[in-house]
């Protein structure tokens, strides 16, 4: 077995997450075969009515500039069937911190790499938000050998089929230490079984393998795969009814430009008046967590999801006013400091960033109670109430102007500094 050790240490006085040593391993083929024969997927279902959609499907492709995706044969055709989010931004480089930031956590803790990580169990995730309303969730990872597989990749050699660093919730001990949660991380065979048997969850994250997502091929290949994957699903009423389907990318392929990524929404929950149009509202990966919280009345994690803009029609329905962001000086291509840094592209620092605990946040439902309890009395490390992440200490995304005009005519504005 191949082993790599990485120690995550904490600042002594603020040990709010348990330090531990993580082990990157490749189970033997015999161990994998045994697990395949015994570990069964877990497919909970729920029917919690949302404000504007009842199911959310998130599909990620890899490493492509906006213009390159827009020039493909199939992706613009699909986008015209729904709503193109013209101003949607990834939040850093490389890939793994975007996966971590977007779905489970709302932060990266300094992650500037695609390493093997295990994040302590008292760090809250989006799964904890869903649990407050008993909303069923699931991940579908193409090439995963069995539900809840925790190895770094599969197979160990050859083409990159499944890789751990594209599997957001497997990074968290609060998921891997829970047998039911772990079995909700499944493969594509389980996806089609769940589809056929009408037991899809209300939230799902879908990761193609490294060939189909374009990482080891190109955008033409991944665009063709997307067309083949989605075309049949879009004809399935069970899949599309009251469903919002997002197709997006983890990051741009060019690191020196702004991290604006090609993103569009499909499905029966896209408002009729928005079909075939473009939305120029400023969004980030964090906007997804914030919009899910708004849709289902969930609290915030108190991190960068707190101040993120909401999907425009959701904001209109709730009365929240999104910020306009001047992106002329915005790049979103660097990671803030933290304990998961390799000290290469961000600064390693042993202390874990403290979330905000007293903000109402854009979703309007306050902060998750366990987050408030864990960090009670501490001051937030960053200004998590802004519509994009920035850090004065490292100089990331500073000097960016943002503003909004409230319904009473009052103008609120600021500059990240």
Curated annotation (Swiss-Prot):
Record GO terms (molecular function): acid phosphatase activity
Catalytic activity: a phosphate monoester + H2O = an alcohol + phosphate
Compartment list: Secreted
Top-rank taxon: Eukaryota
Signal peptide: 1-19
Residues the record marks as carrying a glycan: 122, 187, 209, 218, 333, 383
Gene3D superfamilies: Alkaline Phosphatase, subunit A
Top enzyme class: hydrolase
Enzyme Commission number(s) from the entry: 3.1.3.2
PTM entry text: The N-terminus is blocked.
Active site as annotated: 216 (proton donor)
Keywords linked to the UniProt accession: Glycoprotein, Hydrolase, Secreted, Signal
Predominant subcellular localization, coarse grouping: secreted
GO cellular component assignments: extracellular region
Annotated GO biological process: phospholipid catabolic process
Name this protein carries in UniProt: Acid phosphatase
Annotated source species: Aspergillus niger
């Amino acid at each position: 077995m191949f082993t790599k050790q990485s120690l995550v240490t904490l600042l002594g006085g603020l040990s709010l997450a348990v330090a531990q040593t993580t082990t990157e391993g490749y189970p033997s083929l015999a161990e994998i075969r045994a697990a395949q024969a015994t570990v069964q997927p877990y497919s909970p279902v729920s029917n919690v009515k949302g404000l504007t959609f009842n199911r959310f499907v998130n599909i990620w492709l890899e490493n492509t500039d906006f213009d390159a995706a827009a020039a493909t044969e199939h992706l613009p055709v699909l986008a015209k069937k729904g709503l193109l989010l013209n101003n949607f931004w990834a939040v850093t480089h490389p890939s793994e911190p975007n996966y971590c930031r977007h779905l489970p956590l709302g932060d990266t803790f300094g992650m500037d790499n695609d390493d093997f990580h295990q994040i302590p169990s008292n760090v809250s995730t989006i799964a904890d938000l869903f649990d407050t309303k008993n909303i069923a969730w699931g991940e579908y990872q193409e090439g995963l050998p069995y539900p809840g597989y925790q190895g770094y990749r599969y197979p160990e050699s050859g083409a990159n089929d499944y890789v751990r660093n594209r599997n957001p919730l497997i990074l968290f001990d609060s998921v891997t230490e829970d047998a039911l949660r772990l079995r909700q991380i499944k493969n594509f065979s389980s996806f089609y079984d769940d589809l056929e048997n009408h037991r899809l969850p209300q939230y799902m994250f879908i990761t193609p393998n490294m060939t189909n997502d374009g990482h080891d091929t190109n955008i033409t290949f991944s665009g063709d795969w997307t067309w083949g994957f989605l075309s049949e699903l879009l004809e399935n009423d069970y899949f599309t009814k009251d469903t919002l389907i997002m197709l997006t990318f983890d990051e741009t392929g060019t690191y020196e430009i702004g991290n604006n990524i090609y993103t569009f929404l499909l499905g029966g929950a896209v408002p009729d008046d928005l079909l075939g149009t473009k939305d120029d509202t400023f969004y980030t990966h964090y906007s997804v967590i914030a919009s899910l919280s708004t849709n289902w009345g969930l609290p915030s994690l108190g991190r960068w999801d707190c101040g993120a803009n909401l999907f425009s029609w959701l904001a209109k329905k709730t009365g929240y006013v999104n910020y306009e962001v001047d992106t002329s000086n915005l790049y979103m291509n660097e990671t803030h400091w933290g304990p998961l840094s390799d000290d290469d592209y961000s600064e390693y620092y042993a202390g874990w960033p403290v979330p905000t605990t007293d903000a109402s946040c854009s979703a309007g439902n306050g902060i998750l109670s366990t987050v408030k309890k864990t960090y009670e009395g501490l001051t937030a490390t960053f200004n998590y109430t802004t519509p994009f992440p920035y850090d004065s200490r490292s100089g990331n995304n500073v000097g960016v102007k943002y503003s909004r005009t409230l319904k009473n005519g009052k103008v609120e504005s600021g500059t990240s500094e």
